[in-house]
């Protein structure tokens, strides 16, 4: 028995040394090498990146010390539609949708806090805080009431935004996110449903994975699209996600201390808001199969449900025309 305990102690000691070497030696070296690699990548792709940028009205502003980057399309005097992107995305996730949405509206697609060219200095990623800061951006632009269209993790913040500040919302289109909060869902159940949430509870693991944005974006997109992931789209997304600091702050969204699942999911289903809500969902998303929306008609009586066909998680890339058509019908009906 003593021999076994000594052996076990040696094994555990070696494992601890290997883990320490990985965390304190290998990971920092890898991070430096990747930073240099992606700095070169951005330099090599600067021209094509800038060419895409010229196709949209790019803007930067500072609100309460936070820098925000956003693009605009449509009528600058029209009713506003705010577009919120998910992970690992940016304003660019709406590139193919924006030109197809009614151009009589003022369309604003932002780089959400921590992403792309928006702020990465603030450390508070509580969902309510980020939602409030996003509203502050709109207020600074002279916008009081607006529609919200959100996708993936943008829907987390979008849902909190419309729940906390319904007086500013004209209508809400939420895409690619759970709608019905599972009964008696504790954190363990939530993690089983969404294992990536558990994985990214470790900021080290989240930053480690996102720190290689080319690999991370390839892994996420290619498995969750029904159409080919083309190279220009991939390169633009990698360029923006590889900006220094992004991989360090984006995992903050996943930390449990920042969560409020009821505001992000439950309240949307059960609340009769003074504005219409549309759940727009891809019909071929393995992470969110149709079965989890089977009870929407009975449990979420104030929410409209619509499917995007032949699309997966990134339906804004797979089927931008369907997405835009659904948005147009929704905003026209909400007038």
Task: Give short role names for the model-derived ranges.
Residues 1-17:
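N-terminal Sec-pathway targeting helices
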Residues 2, 47-50, 103:
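Compositionally biased, low-complexity segments enriched in small residues
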Residues 18-73, 92, 108, 115-149, ...:
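Flexible "cap/lid" subdomain of the alpha/beta-hydrolase fold that forms the substrate-access gate
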Residues 73-117:
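Conserved HGGG/HGGXW glycine-rich cap/lid loop of the alpha/beta-hydrolase fold
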Residues 95, 131, 321:
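Conserved active-site region of classical short-chain dehydrogenase/reductase
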Residues 311-320, 324:
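Catalytic histidine-centered segment of alpha/beta-hydrolase-like enzymes
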């Amino acid at each position: 028995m003593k021999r076994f305990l000594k052996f076990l102690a040696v094994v555990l000691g070696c494992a601890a040394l290997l883990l320490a070497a990985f965390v304190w030696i290998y990971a920092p070296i890898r991070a430096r090498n990747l930073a240099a690699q992606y700095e070169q990548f951005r330099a090599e792709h600067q021209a094509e990146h800038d060419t895409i940028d010229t196709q949209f009205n790019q803007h930067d502003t500072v609100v309460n010390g936070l820098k925000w980057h956003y693009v605009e399309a449509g009528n600058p005097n029209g009713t506003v539609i705010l577009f919120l992107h998910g992970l690992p995305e940016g304003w660019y996730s709406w590139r193919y949708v924006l030109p197809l949405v009614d151009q009589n509206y003022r369309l604003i697609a932002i780089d959400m806090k921590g992403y792309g060219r928006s702020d990465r200095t603030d450390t508070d990623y509580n969902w309510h805080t980020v939602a409030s800061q996003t509203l502050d951006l709109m207020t600074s632009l002279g916008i009081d009431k607006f529609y919200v269209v959100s996708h993936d993790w943008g829907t987390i913040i979008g849902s909190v935004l419309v729940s906390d500040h319904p007086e500013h919302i004209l209508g809400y289109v939420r895409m690619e996110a759970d709608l019905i909060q599972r009964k008696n869902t504790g954190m363990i159940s939530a993690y089983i449903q969404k294992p990536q949430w558990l994985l990214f509870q470790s900021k080290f693991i989240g930053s480690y994975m996102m720190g290689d944005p080319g690999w991370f974006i390839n892994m996420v997109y290619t498995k969750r699209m029904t159409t080919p992931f083309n190279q220009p789209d991939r390169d633009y997304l990698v360029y923006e996600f590889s900006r220094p600091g992004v991989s360090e702050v984006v995992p903050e969204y996943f930390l449990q201390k920042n969560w409020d699942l009821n505001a992000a999911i439950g309240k949307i289903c059960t609340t009769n808001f003074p504005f219409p809500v549309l759940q727009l969902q891809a019909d071929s998303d393995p992470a969110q199969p149709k079965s989890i929306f089977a009870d929407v008609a009975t449990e979420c009586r104030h929410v409209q449900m619509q499917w995007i066909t032949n699309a997966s998680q990134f339906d804004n890339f797979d089927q931008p025309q369907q997405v835009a058509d659904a948005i147009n019908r929704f905003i026209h009906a909400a007038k």
